[in-house]
Amino acid sequence: MKKVWLNRYPADVPTEINPDRYQSLVDMFEQSVARYADQPAFVNMGEVMTFRKLEERSRAFAAYLQQGLGLKKGDRVALMMPNLLQYPVALFGILRAGMIVVNVNPLYTPRELEHQLNDSGASAIVIVSNFAHTLEKVVDKTAVQHVILTRMGDQLSTAKGTLVNFVVKYIKRLVPKYHLPDAISFRSALHNGYRMQYVKPELVPEDLAFLQYTGGTTGVAKGAMLTHRNMLANLEQVNATYGPLLHPGKELVVTALPLYHIFALTINCLLFIELGGQNLLITNPRDIPGLVKELAKYPFTAITGVNTLFNALLNNKEFQQLDFSSLHLSAGGGMPVQQVVAERWVKLTGQYLLEGYGLTECAPLVSVNPYDIDYHSGSIGLPVPSTEAKLVDDDDNEVSPGQPGELCVRGPQVMLGYWQRPDATDEIIKNGWLHTGDIAVMDEEGFLRIVDRKKDMILVSGFNVYPNEIEDVVMQHPGVQEVAAVGVPSGSSGEAVKIFVVKKDPSLTEESLVTFCRRQLTGYKVPKLVEFRDELPKSNVGKILRRELRDEARGKVDNKA
């Protein structure tokens, strides 16, 4: 496919990037922390950590992993916490030790955590105490040998940290009891690491940096193997696209999206480290009044988010009173940005929401609307520099211009493959082209618009939910005979999970089924709607017709609207 989109690039956006500008993320990090040493890198709960402090603490943590725990280059280290100052310290410590970061959603259930730890072969985990009770239930069934435990306030000044830890544990009761007698405290790890020798590993661009887990059409979470080069390439692609709006050493980005999610990891954490910017870490973005109070304290210049976050902010009266004069970048992704939200955003802030599209397997950015656009296009924008895109039919032939086809992408940001899953890798990457599973159309300027999903994936607040996983869990309930899970439109989260169930036990209730699911699934995966049926529609070979149920369920929602 001819790169027609290049003609629509703003004049100061390059058509190609250099993915080999740095040898590794460690090289990028070390150059930035030296260049911006005394400037603030992260702020959380009013506590500022400079680039110099970040360098010192991450070096100490890397030394502890190497010398204190005896871990080697290539070992996997899991990281399970919300946005706290400990996160970047641990993240860059793991990378600087030559190890591979395995990001874990802290809201995972024991079942989900056990799978990810075993699949990745993680030998250590850094976890905040609020979720230690989850780890306790499964740690003995995994290869994890070392548990490094931190508390919410451990990277704050002594007085503030002590107060935060007390309030979190005893007043808010956010730390369920746990028993991990061999755990090492994060503070002790740093204290000991300062006295140990750090040995910078020899890293090459093709070394793995992250195993970033994502669902799959099989419903089993798989680790996308993202190399240092993959991440650096996407970093340069994002920088090339947004760069004209950004000023090195002078940015403050609002990071309400969790850093364990690939969107915030690349666009907030890594990009603004390279640019010498400051990350305002929001630990609990669901507390909108608390988030707005934080925003009022800082002249933020950039904000990233998903549609649900922007919508919640727009509906907050205090947010409407904020000063937006410093803001010059608003980036939306993870799920489609609704037109009404985009229009309200520009009316209030004076800035257009630049919607983009990506997936974990692409580190993540594939396309984004150009920064000079002055309307809400409803599209996912143009492919980013050094990225090829084509639309194909079911036989892998390119479709005619303007016709829908599966979006396929090729570029330096595309993952190596899925960790220890060659068959799944071969299904998604063919001749270097990653098949996204999304059906798109491209207009004459190169703007892409997603029209459907080939996969049955459900997108809840920017998180992928795979029907097979939901169905596997529901089928474990003794009162269920058959189940099908689909996504239906939701005003608050984009989509919500609905299940159609055929009962085995006539006394089965919606309430008991949802309660059962809550024990097995992270909150956003739990079905919000349950409909009991005498039978489910099936194909002539007995396959449940999810699409038929989905169309029917969406029709009901549309009719109600």
From Swiss-Prot:
Binding residues for ATP: Y213, T214, G215, G216, T217, T218, G219, V220, A221, K222, G223, A224
SUPFAM superfamilies: Acetyl-CoA synthetase-like
UniProt key word Magnesium: yes
UniProt record similarity statement: Belongs to the ATP-dependent AMP-binding enzyme family.
CDD domains: FC-FACS_FadD_like (cd05936)
Keywords, alphabetical: ATP-binding, Fatty acid metabolism, Ligase, Lipid metabolism, Magnesium, Membrane, Nucleotide-binding
Gene3D superfamilies cross-referenced by the UniProt entry: 3.30.300.30, N-terminal domain of ligase-like
Biological process annotations from GO: fatty acid beta-oxidation
GO CC, any one term: membrane
Catalytic activity: a long-chain fatty acid + ATP + CoA = a long-chain fatty acyl-CoA + AMP + diphosphate
First-listed, main subcellular location of the protein, grouped into a coarse class: membrane
Its job: Catalyzes the esterification, concomitant with transport, of exogenous long-chain fatty acids into metabolically active CoA thioesters for subsequent degradation or incorporation into phospholipids.
Bilayer disposition of the protein: Peripheral membrane protein
Pathway connected to this protein: Lipid metabolism; fatty acid beta-oxidation
Organism, as annotated: Escherichia coli O157:H7
GO molecular function: ATP binding; long-chain fatty acid-CoA ligase activity
Keyword Ligase part of the UniProt annotation: yes
UniProt cofactor(s): Mg(2+)
Record-given protein name: Long-chain-fatty-acid--CoA ligase
Pfam families, alphabetized: AMP-binding, AMP-binding_C
